[in-house]
Amino acid sequence: MAAATRSCRPWGSLLGLIWLVSAAAASWDLSSLRCNFGSFCECDFQPDFQGLECDLAQHLAGQHLARSLVVKALKAFLQDPAPTKPLVLSLHGWTGTGKSYVSSLLAHYLFRDGLRSPHVHHFSPVIHFPHPSHLERYKKDLKSWVQGNLTVCSRSLFLFDEMDKLAPGLIEVLRPFLGSSWVVYGTNYRKAIFIFISNTGGEQINQVVLEAWRSRREREEIGLQELGPVISQAVLDNPHHGFWRSGIMEEHLLDVLVPFLPLQRHHVRHCVLNELAHLGLEPRDEVVQAVLDSTIFFPEDEPLFSSNGCKMVASRIAFFL
């Protein structure tokens, strides 16, 4: 999936461009002055809904449900001047379906410096919590890190990748921060956003989509009402998931479970064309076909879904160019 730009809205007329540049310059002068004397936290937080929705529509292949749920939840949360709790999203689905891509887009379109922002915190089990025997130290460090950074900036984004590989018991230290009753002195921690990413529930999502296809239902007809329960059960039944016995799901601290559907051949083709455009290359039928031919689709008797979504598209394009 192609990398994001700050806004994918095309330029309009020359007059409109001149006005936009003038307005941007005036806005920059005022905001720069304010940021020099004010809070860098608030200045770094610059939501761009138009850019986000445009990028999701153009580059996120086959995920009507995820796109709708994320945008709706985010808009409702940010339009509330006094939210009662942080926004907590849990992204679920097969590998390569766009979970990490969406989380990176959120960072990109919410913060001026995107993933490089000091207010965006990205955690990976392999990098940050590699040794299960150090669990108690990790719990202490994680709680301290979250509380300290929320004290500095309430508009913080915390991304937790590969929840399937996170040591059970670690994430329970976040439980007080995800509800409405915790007190972090000096800041409104309820303005924070937490995003959890995992493959758990992917098989169950795939099965629902496969059954819909067999029943000749459009995938756009699949809703959260039929996917939410199977995802929740898959998480609760998985002793290796970071939410295992954490109380987070049991106490309903997740605002939205976001399902990512398996990708079909035409979705992978969409990813290939997007990646070629991102590289500044014209569409080449032989490259597109070569990537599709090298992609494994499942199930074996009905090769419908890509086994790794669009995850390998970029590397395969480089190989076939």
UniProtKB/Swiss-Prot annotation:
<dbReference type="InterPro" id="IPR049337">
    <property type="entry name" value="TOR1A_C"/>
</dbReference>
<dbReference type="InterPro" id="IPR017378">
    <property type="entry name" value="Torsin_1/2"/>
</dbReference>
<comment type="similarity">
    <text>Belongs to the ClpA/ClpB family. Torsin subfamily.</text>
</comment>
<dbReference type="GO" id="GO:0051085">
    <property type="term" value="P:chaperone cofactor-dependent protein refolding"/>
</dbReference>
<keyword id="KW-0067">ATP-binding</keyword>
<dbReference type="Pfam" id="PF21376">
    <property type="entry name" value="TOR1A_C"/>
</dbReference>
<dbReference type="GO" id="GO:0016887">
    <property type="term" value="F:ATP hydrolysis activity"/>
</dbReference>
<dbReference type="GO" id="GO:0005635">
    <property type="term" value="C:nuclear envelope"/>
</dbReference>
<protein>
    <recommendedName>
        <fullName>Torsin-2A</fullName>
    </recommendedName>
</protein>
<keyword id="KW-0256">Endoplasmic reticulum</keyword>
<dbReference type="GO" id="GO:0042802">
    <property type="term" value="F:identical protein binding"/>
</dbReference>
<dbReference type="GO" id="GO:0005788">
    <property type="term" value="C:endoplasmic reticulum lumen"/>
</dbReference>
<dbReference type="Pfam" id="PF06309">
    <property type="entry name" value="Torsin"/>
</dbReference>
<dbReference type="GO" id="GO:0005524">
    <property type="term" value="F:ATP binding"/>
</dbReference>
<keyword id="KW-0732">Signal</keyword>
<dbReference type="InterPro" id="IPR001270">
    <property type="entry name" value="ClpA/B"/>
</dbReference>
<dbReference type="InterPro" id="IPR010448">
    <property type="entry name" value="Torsin"/>
</dbReference>
<feature type="signal peptide">
    <location>
        <begin position="1"/>
        <end position="26"/>
    </location>
</feature>
<comment type="subunit">
    <text>Homohexamer. Interacts with TOR1AIP1.</text>
</comment>
<keyword id="KW-0547">Nucleotide-binding</keyword>
<keyword id="KW-0325">Glycoprotein</keyword>
<feature type="binding site">
    <location>
        <begin position="93"/>
        <end position="100"/>
    </location>
    <ligand>
        <name>ATP</name>
    </ligand>
</feature>
<dbReference type="InterPro" id="IPR027417">
    <property type="entry name" value="P-loop_NTPase"/>
</dbReference>
<feature type="glycosylation site" description="N-linked (GlcNAc...) asparagine">
    <location>
        <position position="149"/>
    </location>
</feature>
